[in-house]
Amino acid sequence: MEPKFYSIAIDGPAGAGKSTLAKALAARLGFLYVDTGAIYRTVGLSVARSGGDCGDKAQVLARLPEIRIAMTYGEDGLQHMLLNGEDVTKAIRENAVSGYASLVSAYPEVRAFLLDMQRELARTHNVIMDGRDIGTVVLPGADVKVFLTASPEERAKRRCRELEQRGQPVDYRQLLEEITQRDYADSHRAAAPLKQAEDAALLDTSALDFDASLEALLAIVKERVPL
């Protein structure tokens, strides 16, 4: 009998804290954490570095065959992104790359290009995977589905703090506008739009700190998976 692997899908808008909470939950449970947003960021970074326009579908698709993406996991269990052999884990966290990711992720061909990579990880590991369409498209049969959200204002504040800690100060109003625009783009795109799966639990962390959010997330998981 093949071993049973559990999959936890966490979806939600930009800046909702998906990656931070999913990473902490994976460490708590001993699961593999898969940040799918990092994969799209890597594609966007590759296109931009080569002089391509991420908003031009033809230019993006023309560059796909040249892109070699790999994921590795260090002893700390953290995911590292490799682009044609180069570790770009830090580079993809620059604020501009977030916009690139939103653009390239709107193309069905890009999503199809990356789908098998994501599903293979879930076939062979206990995984916690976060993104925009994990519970609806990538892992529709996930054992646990959570739609994680927070108000745009709270997400902008959190993102500001995160960027400041990285030495990348940004204007709050500008960031709030970018988040609002990305929410619209992600939820209105033709390919795998951002939406809550019908069988997903909703977790709004607007009024919760990190510890309370993590405990609430853990409670949802324990209701659905025998841990």
Residue ranges and their predicted role:
Residues 27-93:
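N-terminal phosphate/diphosphate-binding loop that engages ATP/GTP or pyrophosphate donors
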Residues 18:
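Conserved lysine of the Walker
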Residues 21:
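Hydrophobic positions on the alpha1 helix immediately C-terminal to the Walker A/P-loop
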Residues 89-166:
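ATP-dependent NMP and nucleoside kinases share a basic, alpha-helical "lid"
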Residues 14:
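The conserved Walker
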Residues 1-7:
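Extreme N-terminal, non-catalytic leader segments
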Residues 73, 118-125, 132-137, 141, ...:
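Small-molecule kinase domains that catalyze NTP-dependent phosphoryl transfer to phosphate-bearing small molecules
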